[in-house]
Amino acid sequence: MLTAAQRLRRSTDFAAAVRGGRRVGRGVVVVHLTLPGTLPDVSSSKPARDTGAEQTSAPARAGFVVSKAVGNAVVRNAVRRRLRHLVRERLPGLPAGSTLVVRALPTAAHRSYQRLGVDLDAAIAAARAPRGRRSR
C-alpha cells in the first residue's frame, strides 16, 4: 500500500500531471511522468526558490486511472491493486517531488503480473529518458 503522502487524490493533481508530464505508452499501460521543477506553481505567491525547495522535499507521488473499458468493478480493482503494488516497488527510484500517473488500457485485465511489470518498467524508463530530436 502506498502511504497517504505518496498518493494522488485530487483531480487537480491528476490533471496537472497528465497535462504537464511526459506521456509514454508501452504495452497495456500509459505513464504520465512529471519531474520536479517542470510544472510552475501558480497557486503560491512565495518566491520561486522557496517553491522549488518544497517540491523537491516532497516524496514522489503516484495515481492510477483504470476506466470502465477495462472491465467491471472487480476487474478494475484487481488491475489497480496489481499496478499499485508494482508502482510501490518503483516509486523510491523516482526523484523526490515527481508525479506519476499510470493509466491502464482495456487489455490490462488479461496481462500477467510479470508482463504488467515489464510494461511499466519500459514506460517509466522511456518517460525518464531525455527527449531526442525527431527526424522528419
From Swiss-Prot:
It is an enzyme of class 3 (hydrolase). InterPro entries: Ribosomal_Su5_D2-typ_SF, Ribsml_uS5_D2-typ_fold_subgr, RNase_P, RNase_P_CS. GO terms for cellular component: ribonuclease P complex. GO terms for molecular function: 3'-tRNA processing endoribonuclease activity; ribonuclease P activity; tRNA binding. It catalyses: Endonucleolytic cleavage of RNA, removing 5'-extranucleotides from tRNA precursor. One of its GO terms (biological process) is tRNA 5'-leader removal. Its EC number is 3.1.26.5. Keywords: Endonuclease, Hydrolase, Nuclease, RNA-binding, tRNA processing. It holds the Pfam family Ribonuclease_P. Residues 39-59 are annotated as: Disordered. Gene3D superfamilies: 3.30.230.10. Belongs to the RnpA family. PANTHER family: RIBONUCLEASE P PROTEIN COMPONENT. RNaseP catalyzes the removal of the 5'-leader sequence from pre-tRNA to produce the mature 5'-terminus. It can also cleave other RNA substrates such as 4.5S RNA. The protein component plays an auxiliary but essential role in vivo by binding to the 5'-leader sequence and broadening the substrate specificity of the ribozyme. Consists of a catalytic RNA component (M1 or rnpB) and a protein subunit. HAMAP family: RNase_P. This is Ribonuclease P protein component.
